[in-house]
A protein has these predicted regions:
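FAD-binding core of FAD-dependent oxidoreductases
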Residues: 78-91, 112-120
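Glycine- and other small-residue-rich loops at beta-strand/loop junctions that grip anionic moieties
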Residues: 32-35, 94, 122
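Glycine-rich, Trp-frequent "lid" loop and neighboring beta-strands that shape
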Residues: 59, 100-137
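N-terminal glycine-rich flavin-associated loop
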Residues: 81-100, 127-129
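Short alpha-helix boundary/capping motifs
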Residues: 47-48, 97-98, 134
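Conserved catalytic core of Hanks-type protein kinase domains
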Residues: 72, 95, 109
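Amphipathic, small/basic residue-rich leader segments at the start of a protein or domain
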Residues: 1-84, 104
Length: 137
């Protein structure tokens, strides 16, 4: 098994390392915590970089590429929210939404940097308590 990163993955790391180091300064993170959110220009900067790389990638942004992005943002800022939720919600949407819905949501995300997404969970004997869910094989 080859665990070496591809040139594309190295480019993703470099791009988001530069973004994280330039944007997630201790002063900025402190202010955003006080404001209880990230400014529009920060989330839009993230989304612009994400989709620019996604458009260049032959296979698009898979879960491994998304994990590398989150790792870099955590390295710079100590956390990756809200981007972590956005990226994993994109994975869910890609797997289950029809093309019409998916395309509309992605277009809006590209334009605004804000992903309007919610995930409902309901399981027999657990309801929405995801920690109480059980599976069997």
């Amino acid at each position: 098994m080859d665990f070496a990163l591809s040139d594309n993955q190295k480019n993703i790391i470099a791009t988001f390392r530069e973004f994280g180091e330039s944007v997630f300064t201790p002063e900025s993170v402190f202010q955003w915590r006080k404001d209880q959110g990230l400014p529009d220009e920060v989330v839009k900067g993230f989304v612009d970089r994400y989709f620019a790389l996604d458009d260049q990638s032959p296979d698009g942004m898979g879960i491994m590429s998304q994990a590398l992005i989150l790792e870099e943002l955590c390295r710079c800022a100590g956390a990756a929210l809200p981007f972590q939720n956005d990226l994993f919600n994109l994975q869910i949407m890609g797997g289950f939404a029809d093309e019409t819905v998916s395309s509309r949501v992605l277009d809006d995300y590209r334009q605004t940097g804000r992903l309007m997404f919610s995930l409902g969970v309901s399981e027999p004997n657990a309801g929405s308590d995801t920690m109480s869910m059980t599976t069997s094989v």
